[in-house]
Amino acid sequence: MIDVLKPPPSSGLIREVRFFLEFPRLMLRFPDLARQPRGRGEPILILPGYGAGDGSTIVLKSYLRLLGYRARGWGLGRNSGNVRDLLPRVLKKMASFARRAQQEVHLIGWSLGGYLAREVARERPDLVRQVITLGTPVVGGPKYTVVARAFHRQGIDVDAIEAEIELRNQISFHTPVTAIYSRKDAVVSWEACIDRDAANVEHIEVRTTHLGFGFSPEVYKIIAKRLAVEADSLRHGLASNSPQRREATPTRRRH
């Protein structure tokens, strides 16, 4: 399967400017979004994508706070893409957040931030309630993204990164994951966002660009509903992977 994957063509990047269209859509849909189920201070940590920082997720964070969640950015500056350096730092941040909140943390990760969120859940499933990823490549790392060419020019071995990720993916984890992806994504190959092995992953397709994930009203509504399901399960004392919780989760959308 991996052999047939390719990064999106550079010519498609012009489509990413359409993410500006998400702002008027967000305003038009805001009355409906504001009526989504409310949280009760449940902790949410939002991880930005490669090259981005907390400023890129400020709109999403503000929306989740409006709904009553304790949402915060990761506080680690710009995402350098150095997973080996970032993962222990994110783990420390998340563990501290969970300890102060005295409950499991919901993780939302955009692109590479989603990969980090999955790895945090793999390392500390006891502290993570759920993971929501936005346009996150789960196979190949940067290999099936438009930044692959830049990595090649820098002498970075993307094949070695892919092999390392394959090994990591063999370590199973049971934290529920909602993987939101788009065939209109011109940065990450949408096929690379599909986890074909893990039973704990639900894939949901949306119509937005890669840059639009953080501002799409469709994405916001999905996130709000997923948070509500897990928050309600927690209030009723259900484990995140319990049969009752799975029954309450909306049917997965086929890809």
Annotate each language-model stretch with its function.
Residues 40-59, 63-78, 83-175, 180, ...:
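Serine-dependent carboxylesterase/thioesterase catalytic core
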Residues 186-192:
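Conserved alpha/beta-hydrolase "acid-adjacent" motif
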Residues 81-83, 210-218:
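Catalytic histidine-centered segment of alpha/beta-hydrolase-like enzymes
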Residues 70-72, 198-213, 223:
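Catalytic histidine neighborhood in serine/cysteine hydrolases
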Residues 87, 215-227:
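Post-His helix in hydrolase/transferase enzymes
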Residues 93, 97, 222-233:
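C-terminal alpha-helix
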Residues 1-44, 57, 62, 67, ...:
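Flexible, membrane-associating and regulatory peripheral segments of lipid-active enzymes
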Residues 173-186, 206-208:
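Conserved strand-to-loop "acid loop" that flanks and positions the catalytic carboxylate
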